[in-house]
């Protein structure tokens, strides 16, 4: 309880509050993820198969599973699938893996997906998270879009730790945002970064 926390801080030192973080987070949502299924955004025929699978968690992929020539089409396919398919009726947690922050695709991925279908997205999967500021950037963008578009659903963030930089900053990444719901370890990209 936040009010109890503040009261405890004040009781601890009545004259002044030595430290008070600007980050008062509610616990992130807990979602069932017994199994995950990655679906390339460039293959719409696979969306229906994913919907009818036994996977609890489906991530629609804009990153590694999509060739550079198909990125924009894949984004449009995912927006259409989010709007037209009722994933939640089948009990699916839906995530979209955007392109990493070091690409020119990431910005449009996040804006177009969330502005057009944000109420249908449970989480954004951030690849190659290297620092807490990477997560902070996505968090700030999500907040701005949600407020601007009056999106009711607060979208979570999941981070892929896939680089030596990300691993060395994992503690800071883990506590970087109240939206953060999960950390995933990307073994292949991590090994390549060493």
State each model region's role.
Residues 1-19:
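Short, Lys/Arg-enriched N-terminal segments with co-localized hydrophobic residues
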């Amino acid at each position: 309880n936040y009010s109890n926390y503040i009261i405890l801080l004040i009781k601890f030192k009545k004259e002044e509050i030595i430290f008070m973080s600007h980050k008062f987070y509610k616990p992130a949502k807990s979602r069932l993820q017994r199994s995950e299924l990655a679906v390339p955004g460039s293959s719409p025929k696979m969306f229906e198969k994913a919907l009818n699978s036994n996977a609890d968690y489906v991530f629609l992929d804009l990153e590694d599973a999509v060739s550079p020539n198909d990125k924009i089409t894949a984004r449009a396919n995912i927006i259409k699938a989010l709007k037209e398919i009722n994933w939640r009726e089948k009990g699916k947690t839906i995530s979209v893996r955007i392109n990493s922050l070091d690409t020119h695709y990431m910005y449009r991925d996040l804006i177009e997906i969330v502005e057009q279908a944000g109420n249908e997205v449970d989480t954004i999967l951030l690849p190659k998270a290297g620092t807490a500021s990477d997560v902070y950037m996505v968090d700030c963008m999500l907040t701005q879009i949600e407020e601007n578009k009056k999106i009711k659903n607060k979208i979570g963030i999941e981070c892929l730790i896939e680089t030596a930089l990300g691993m060395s900053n994992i503690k800071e990444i883990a506590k970087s945002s109240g939206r953060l719901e999960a950390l995933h370890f990307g073994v292949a990209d991590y090994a390549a970064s060493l």
